């Protein structure tokens, strides 16, 4: 009976009973140079990164919304916000009771990019969110706006998350949710999907957390650059906007000195952490600060997606270390093939990393599941097979 004295992984061991047959899940911490920099004293001066820093700022300048875009989206958001505020204060005969309206998303956070002039508002209803109520609110808002300014051409479309109002060069998406006690009273046939409502409430929590913790300008610039990176490299597509927000904040602010790192250092650090397996199964990852229960944000991705993010980052880290930053940043033509095809940098050939995860073959009917006794907590750690 070897189970009496724990042989499991982890600092405290594990007490495995004779009939349990599983090990507790102990996440590992991927290597991050900036957390343990004192253990690696420099033997030569740091390389000159001024050209890389200039390129990052140039790319951010290219990606930032123009003055005209900012003015048009601000104007539309302000008008819609005022109309909804008036409905809250003085609804009159209007039956759709509103609790509050909040700005969320990249508009609120200051991480919008040019060419995507879309802002998000969350409207919290006091009543149950029926499709009729959503449509009535959308019609009421757009008709009020048209009355205020008949010359402005506006369109209103309802969708599964609420509705959106568009002018010639800006769009405001209104995400509908309800007060939390109403979530228990929903009828799937009459009301908006509960996942949509919960997602809108989460967006409010995200915006509030960002405002309190991630308002540093370096964090905002880095997030805009990461969103651009995600849009140009298919391997990063699984990274959600919220994951990118948290990754950007972590890379800039999470270090022993608690002082924000420079943009060039933070950008490299993002790729280095992803390449080291920050978002792989078994990794401690980044805990969602807006959810309870130590939820690690990368677990929303499938195992294949987690592996794809890792091996894409590994390839880009190697290219970055050999001076290929202009190509990675999108300053020198299309770079989407960089992560999948061999490239040469100053005589050094960089071969793309290969995937490590192989999807297990589907079981035929009647076959028993060998892992059926493994509890849920240990599943993730056991389920990623690697090819040595």
UniProtKB/Swiss-Prot annotation:
Q: Which UniProt keywords apply?
A: Activator, DNA-binding, Nucleus, Transcription, Transcription regulation
Which intervals carry biased composition (Acidic residues)? 367-388
Start-end of Basic and acidic residues biased regions: 355-366
Instruction: Give a GO biological-process term.
Output: positive regulation of DNA-templated transcription
Keyword Nucleus appears in the UniProt entry = yes
* The DZF domain, residue ranges: 23-370
Q: Which GO terms describe its cellular component?
A: nucleolus; nucleus
* Database matches in PANTHER family: INTERLEUKIN ENHANCER-BINDING FACTOR, INTERLEUKIN ENHANCER-BINDING FACTOR 2
Q: What does this protein do?
A: May regulate transcription of undefined genes.
Q: Give the record's subunit note.
A: Forms heterodimers with ILF3.
Q: What is this protein called?
A: Interleukin enhancer-binding factor 2 homolog
The organism named in the record is Xenopus tropicalis
């Amino acid at each position: 009976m070897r189970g009496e004295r724990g042989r499991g992984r982890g600092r405290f061991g594990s007490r495995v009973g004779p009939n349990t047959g599983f090990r507790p899940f102990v996440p590992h911490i991927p290597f991050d140079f900036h957390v343990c920099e004192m253990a690696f004293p420099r033997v030569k001066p740091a390389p000159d990164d001024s050209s890389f820093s200039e390129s990052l700022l140039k790319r951010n300048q290219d990606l930032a919304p123009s003055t005209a875009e900012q003015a048009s989206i601000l104007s539309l958001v302000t008008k819609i916000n005022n109309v909804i505020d008036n409905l809250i204060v003085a609804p009159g005969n209007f039956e759709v009771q509103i609790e509050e309206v909040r700005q969320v998303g990249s508009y609120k956070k200051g991480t919008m990019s040019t060419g995507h002039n879309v802002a998000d508002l969350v409207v919290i209803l006091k009543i149950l969110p029926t499709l009729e109520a959503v449509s009535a609110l959308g019609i009421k808002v757009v008709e009020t706006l048209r009355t205020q300014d008949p010359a402005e051409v506006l369109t209103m479309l309802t969708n599964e998350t609420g509705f959106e109002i568009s002018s010639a060069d800006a769009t405001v998406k209104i995400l509908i949710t309800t007060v939390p006690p109403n979530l228990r009273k929903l009828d799937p046939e009459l009301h908006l999907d509960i996942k949509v409502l919960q997602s809108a409430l989460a967006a409010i929590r995200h915006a509030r957390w960002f405002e309190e913790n991630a308002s540093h300008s370096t964090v905002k610039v880095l997030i805009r650059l990461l969103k651009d990176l995600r849009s140009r490299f298919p391997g990063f597509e699984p990274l959600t906007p919220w994951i990118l927000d948290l990754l950007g904040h972590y890379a800039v602010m999470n270090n022993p000195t608690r002082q924000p790192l420079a943009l060039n250092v933070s950008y490299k650090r993002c790729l280095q952490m992803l390449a080291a397996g920050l978002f792989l199964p078994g990794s401690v990852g980044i805990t969602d600060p807006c959810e309870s229960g130590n939820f690690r944000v990368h677990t929303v991705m499938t195992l294949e997606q987690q592996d794809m993010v890792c091996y894409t980052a590994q390839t880009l880290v190697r290219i970055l270390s050999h001076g290929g930053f202009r190509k990675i940043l999108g300053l020198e033509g299309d770079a989407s093939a960089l992560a999948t095809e061999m490239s040469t940098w100053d005589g050094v050939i960089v071969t793309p990393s290969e995937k490590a995860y192989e999807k297990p073959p589907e079981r035929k009917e009647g076959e028993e599941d060998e892992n059926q006794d493994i509890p849920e907590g240990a599943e993730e750690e056991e389920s990623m097979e690697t090819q040595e």
